[in-house]
A protein has these predicted regions:
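A solvent-exposed interaction/effector surface
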Residues: 2-176
Length: 176
């Protein structure tokens, strides 16, 4: 009986080790969009993001769940070979989302090795490929999975902090 328990524990340990190895490899190998921290405080930071090539889908969705599911599925299909060249494109971070009452978008930053000419052409005509404008963004973090409620609370906290520090903002918010 104790030998069987030991075997189960060893098997669970091996599964855990393989999972952790896979996640570590995925997290460390995922290309991240380059940015420069301009100002860092305890509860927020201001970053400068240079232009980047993006694949974007637009949506009429006005909540996180609807925009995330429809946008992610379309973009994932594109990078997993749903393009004219049938080429897989590496996933990058962060995934960008903009949610407003007038419409929303989700964007994947394309790996640095691509430009407008070398990036595979999406099969889905609703995927727009373009360069983002360089921008300064104020960033606040929150833990766990994103929900509309968590996003609203984080946004209000960031607006309050920036207002108290007399930092003038322009435009809406994005999820990174």
């Amino acid at each position: 009986k104790s030998m069987k328990s030991l075997s189960i524990i060893l098997l669970l340990g091996a599964i855990y080790f393989v999972f952790q190895s896979f996640m570590s490899k995925y997290l460390f190998e995922t290309e991240k969009q380059v940015y420069r921290v301009v100002k860092k405080e305890a509860d927020f930071e201001i970053r400068y993001y240079p232009e980047a090539l993006m694949a974007t889908v637009y949506s009429k969705g006005t909540n996180y769940k609807s925009v995330a599911s429809s946008g992610f599925n379309k973009l994932a299909k594109f990078i997993f070979g749903g393009n004219q060249q049938k080429e897989s494109i590496s996933m990058t971070a962060p995934v960008r989302m903009s949610i407003t009452d007038n419409g929303s978008s989700m964007s994947f930053v394309m790996p640095k090795k691509y430009n407008n000419q070398s990036l595979p052409t999406p099969n889905d005509p609703n995927i727009e490929i373009k360069k983002s404008l360089p921008e300064y963004v104020a960033v606040i973090s929150f833990g766990g999975y994103a929900t509309d409620e968590k996003i609203a609370v984080a946004y209000q906290n960031l607006v309050k902090i920036l207002s108290e520090k007399k930092i003038i903002t322009k435009g809406g918010y994005k999820l990174l």
